[in-house]
Amino acid sequence: MTETELFKEGLNLMFSGMGFVIIFLLILIWAIGIVSKLINTFFPEPIPVAQAKKTVTPTQSAVVDDIERLRPVIVAAIAHHRRTQGLN
């Protein structure tokens, strides 16, 4: 075989292989779409129930009170840490 014949044979093999791969991928995409539709037909996703909006409750304002109540404790803890680590 000459170089030209080998080159033609290589191109033929390359395009045949690429064609088979593209056809296989298209069939795979088609099959995945069909399986997806079948699964959604037999096992539909539940429709989410709308929940009522929550109103502001006294417990939410208690969170702010907790932060204000803990502020001196946090300041004391930072001061103690700085004192023991020699950062001051």
From Swiss-Prot:
Molecular-function annotations in GO: decarboxylation-driven active transmembrane transporter activity; oxaloacetate decarboxylase activity; sodium ion transmembrane transporter activity
Transmembrane segments: 13-35
Record InterPro entries: Na_pump_deCOase, OadG
Stretches of the chain forming a coiled coil according to its record: none
Pfam family, one: OAD_gamma
EC top class, as a word: translocase
Domain of life, source organism: Bacteria
Gene Ontology cellular component terms for the protein in this record: plasma membrane
Entry annotated with the keyword Ligase: no
Tagged with keyword Glycoprotein: no
Location(s) in or outside the cell: Cell membrane
Catalytic reactions on record: oxaloacetate + 2 Na(+)(in) + H(+) = pyruvate + 2 Na(+)(out) + CO2
Enzyme nomenclature, EC number: 7.2.4.2
Predominant localisation class: membrane
Keywords per UniProt: Cell membrane, Ion transport, Membrane, Sodium, Sodium transport, Translocase, Transmembrane, Transmembrane helix, Transport
GO biological process entries: sodium ion export across plasma membrane
Oligomer and partners: Heterotrimer of an alpha, a beta and a gamma subunit.
Function comment: Catalyzes the decarboxylation of oxaloacetate coupled to Na(+) translocation.
Family from the record: Belongs to the OadG family.
Record protein name field: Probable oxaloacetate decarboxylase gamma chain
